[in-house]
Amino acid sequence: MKSEIKKNDMVKVIAGDDKGKVAKVLAVLPKTSQVIVEGCKVVKKAIKPTDDNPKGGFIHKEKPMHISNVKKA
């Protein structure tokens, strides 16, 4: 599906928990018709301990949302 929304565009979220937010697009996933928007749909993800990060812990990461839930701002 062809989309007018590209990476680094400013978009407004029009549906979901983050409705009304204006933020930058971090990535566009054309195969699934989804976008990743900065600071929207943030989840807490557990990280297992590794050699680089011996304590493990949690990180906050943006999840993709459907492209129909955003419009260009």
Curated annotation (Swiss-Prot):
Question: Per the record, which residues fall in region Disordered?
Answer: 51-73
GO cellular-component term (any): ribosome
Q: Family assignment?
A: Belongs to the universal ribosomal protein uL24 family.
Keyword Ribonucleoprotein assigned: yes
Q: What is the role of the protein in this entry?
A: One of two assembly initiator proteins, it binds directly to the 5'-end of the 23S rRNA, where it nucleates assembly of the 50S subunit.
What protein name is recorded for this chain? Large ribosomal subunit protein uL24
Q: Which Gene3D superfamilies match?
A: 2.30.30.30
Question: What lineage is this protein's organism placed in?
Answer: Bacteria, Pseudomonadati, Campylobacterota, Epsilonproteobacteria, Campylobacterales
